[in-house]
């Protein structure tokens, strides 16, 4: 990410490390929050951190869905957490969450998905600097995947396109993987109060 989550934790007195496998994202985070700690590494590499390092690990927004081998992810996190430590993961109801990006949703407190027969999957934004952004969320439940296709049209006429492949099994499947590895489900937090409908935080604990 760009360092916002680790900065928020730091502001509340929690010292942490931001992990990303993209050097560009690490550099961007350092530009924005130069006093915080970051590590270039892969969550799927068990050697990224030493065993029993952390009291808490967070996996927020759609990070978990970029990870295909979720069993390896949970195994590594189990190793890196201290006994009794917590993992917080952000999951969505894949069939009902709103895939419209926040900047493209004209309804701040009302989900337009509740007032249409067909799920809205397109985002269109024109920024103040003249850049136009389009995105489309394509969902393939038969193989537990989704694709987010993005197009950036800049003021000078240049166009950049990119695709994000997401691996989206059901919440039940993901949580079952975690439980089979040994995590205990401690709490489920509905994110509707912060305008993320059909999205949840799950607090999992490593046994003592």
Where are these regions (language model features)?
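Class I SAM-dependent methyltransferase SAM/SAH-binding core
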Residues: 2-47
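Short conserved AdoMet
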Residues: 30, 68, 82
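A short acidic, Gly/Pro-enriched loop at the edge of an enzyme's catalytic core
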Residues: 47-57
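A short SAM/SAH-binding and catalytic strip from SAM-dependent methyltransferases
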Residues: 55-69
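A cross-domain feature marking catalytic cores of carbohydrate-active enzymes
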Residues: 61, 89-91
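A short glycine-rich, Lys/Arg-flanked "PGG" loop and its adjoining helix->strand segment in the class I
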Residues: 71-86
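SAM-dependent methyltransferase
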Residues: 91-172
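C-terminal lobe and adjacent flexible extensions of AdoMet/dcAdoMet transferase-like proteins
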Residues: 165-208
């Amino acid at each position: 990410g760009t360092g916002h989550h680790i900065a928020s934790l730091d502001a509340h007195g929690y010292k942490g490390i931001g992990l990303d496998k993209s050097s560009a994202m690490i550099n961007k985070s350092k530009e924005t929050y130069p006093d915080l700690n970051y590590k270039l590494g892969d969550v799927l590499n068990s050697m990224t951190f030493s065993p029993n390092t952390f009291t808490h690990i967070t996996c927020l927004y759609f990070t978990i869905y970029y990870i295909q081998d979720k069993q390896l992810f949970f195994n590594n996190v189990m190793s890196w957490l201290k006994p009794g430590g917590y993992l917080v993961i952000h999951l969505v109801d894949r069939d009902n969450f709103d895939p419209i990006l926040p900047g493209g949703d004209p309804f701040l407190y009302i989900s337009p998905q509740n007032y249409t027969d067909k799920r809205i999957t397109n985002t269109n934004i024109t920024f103040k600097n003249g850049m136009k952004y389009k995105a489309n969320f394509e969902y393939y439940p038969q193989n537990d995947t989704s694709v987010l296709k993005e197009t950036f049209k800049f003021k000078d006429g240049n166009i950049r396109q990119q695709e994000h492949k997401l691996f989206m099994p059901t919440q039940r499947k993901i949580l079952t993987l975690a439980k089979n590895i040994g995590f205990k489900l401690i709490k489920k937090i509905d994110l509707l109060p912060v305008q993320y409908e059909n999205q949840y935080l799950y607090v999992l604990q490593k046994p003592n």
